[in-house]
Amino acid sequence: MPLNRTIKIILTVLLLACGVWLGLNRQFYREALASAFIAFALASVIIIHLRLRPAWIDAALILAGTLFLGAIDYRVLHFRPAIMAWLSFAGLSSLVIFGVGAVWAKGAKQKLLVLGYVPALLFVISEYFADNLLRWTSANHPKALDLYLFSFDSSLGVQISFVMGQVFSAWPWLRIVGLLFYIGLPVPIALIYSGQLLRIREKTIPAMVAFLATGPVGVIFFNLFPAIGPAHLFGQGFPWHPFTIAQSAGIIVEPMAIPGPPNAIPSLHMAWVLLVWWYSRGLRLWERSIAFLFMFFTVLATLGTGEHYFIDLIVAFPFALLLESMCALSLKITDRSRVLAFCFGLAGTLGWFALLRNALHFFWTTPVLPWSFCVATIVVSLLCERELQHRTVSPALEKAVASRALSSTT
């Protein structure tokens, strides 16, 4: 038996064994499979899997794996039923079947499947360990800087997170929809990544690295300016009992202990959907429409749930630009557009940290000032990003896209 075939058999057995072990493990079920966040992360595997390998046999095997895990966990092991666990069962089954398919594929098909499978696996792993990073940050920074962010938001003349919170409270259906988009973040990431992988593979590596790096890099910034969110700061007072603008102007800002893991600043959800939108360029209209919908509802959800302040979303623009510039691997480090994007991304993010910590009195002079800074941050970030994208779309890449489009029509 050839060594290559032996290795494939070993990898297949390992994948099957790991899938069954994780699917039937009580602790993993409780900590991960029953979690909505992990469920959507695993569901994103199905999207990449079936877009790269759209075979009925694979879909049937995913369904069979889902029913098998559900039957054993609930009928035999008597785990506590959870709706999201069914989505996790399907995603876990896809992860195993996708991996086996990548192992046994050949040539260009194998390369395509590996480029899809490895990021899908890493996305799930990063989601699973995200809580550990946040707990580590919370342990190192027991006091959060929420009062600084709340004071800035109030200097705008309107407390946007409280307004959106009241809208969510008045219209529960909108809150449910917003939460689904918020928790379902892995879905557009998988959709856009697999779409670019099918369109032109050279663009997928920067996207993959940026999506994966957002979490760890974001946690580094959380350690520089940790915050929890207005819902945690005000507790039962959110969203119907905010301070008045006059009261907010007089509060003494200082670090304070707030229960919960840090969630800012910046808003990583906002950074992710910005990257999804930016990397969706060149894809079909329906793919870009889904990316836009996730961006729109994520903005509503981050504010309406009270998990973020408005300024969190503003700082996400230069932060996302920073990540895109770091991952623009097709450009030289000295490329002007890449350097400009990197410098503004880093300076914009850290500059906001400095202003929020030391210059709140400046923003309270007139609401025109904080609004002007917010608009300027967004506009300059978008201009730098557009120039960066223009430079990364080289003639060689465009030629490859045109060549693949032509071959698909013949």
Name these PLM-found stretches:
Residues 2-12, 49-66, 111-117, 204-211, ...:
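Membrane-interfacial loop-to-transmembrane alpha-helix junctions, especially the N-terminal start
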Residues 18-28, 69-81, 103-105, 351-364:
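Juxtamembrane "helix-exit" motif on the non-cytosolic side of transmembrane helices
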Residues 55-92, 116-189, 392-410:
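N-terminal transmembrane-helix/juxtamembrane module of multi-pass inner/ER membrane proteins
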Residues 113-121, 190-225, 233-234, 290-295:
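Interfacial segments of alpha-helical transmembrane regions
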Residues 174-188, 259-279, 310, 314:
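Membrane-interface loop-to-helix entry segments
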Residues 192-196, 270-288, 318-330:
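Membrane-interfacial alpha-helical segments at the cytosolic side of multi-pass membrane proteins
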Residues 219-288:
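Membrane-interfacial catalytic/cofactor-binding modules of polytopic membrane enzymes
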Residues 342-406:
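Transmembrane helical bundles and short interhelical boundary loops of multi-pass, membrane-embedded
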